[in-house]
């Protein structure tokens, strides 16, 4: 196959992965606002950063990248701390997801160029164009967190409700008929 066709195929894959990442972010926003209160939403996305980061350990195991375990494990630990702190501090979630997008970019750079950005064999292999999908999700969801930061701060104030948005979602109590 000619290099131009290969490059064109890669561009199509990249565009599709970015679109899927954007749709995933939109779906995450829609569902979290539908079913979760502001406080629950912040907790969910804080905890969700942990398995998102953990994907790279799964990739290291799958691709047999034994040399990548120390760096990937350290990255998972850092993202886990950011996620746990983000349960109460919105800025930590914004930074955590944005940094995870950068982490995705580093892996994608290594995958596409064959050259190590951080040193030989220190990062794990990833599926083709996975970094584009994940980085688009991370950046868009971090932007959403920025718009929700004031609501999340307010949700932790004394007397704040923990139930999902009134009239929507699971677990909404029905008003008594009088």
Where are these regions (language model features)?
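Functional transmembrane or membrane-interface alpha-helices that line membrane-embedded catalytic
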Residues: 2-20, 33, 40-50, 74-91, ...
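Polar low-complexity intrinsically disordered regions enriched in Ser/Thr and small residues
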Residues: 24, 30, 170-174
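Aromatic-rich, lipid-facing transmembrane alpha helices and their immediate juxtamembrane interface loops
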Residues: 25, 29-66, 161
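Helix-adjacent hinge/juxtasegments
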Residues: 55-86
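A subset of signal/propeptide-processing and intrinsically disordered low-complexity segments
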Residues: 67, 99, 133, 168-175
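Active-site alpha-helix of zinc metalloproteases
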Residues: 92-96
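Catalytic glutamate of the conserved HExxH
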Residues: 97, 101, 105
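Short, highly charged, low-complexity non-transmembrane loops/tails of multi-pass membrane proteins
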Residues: 152-178
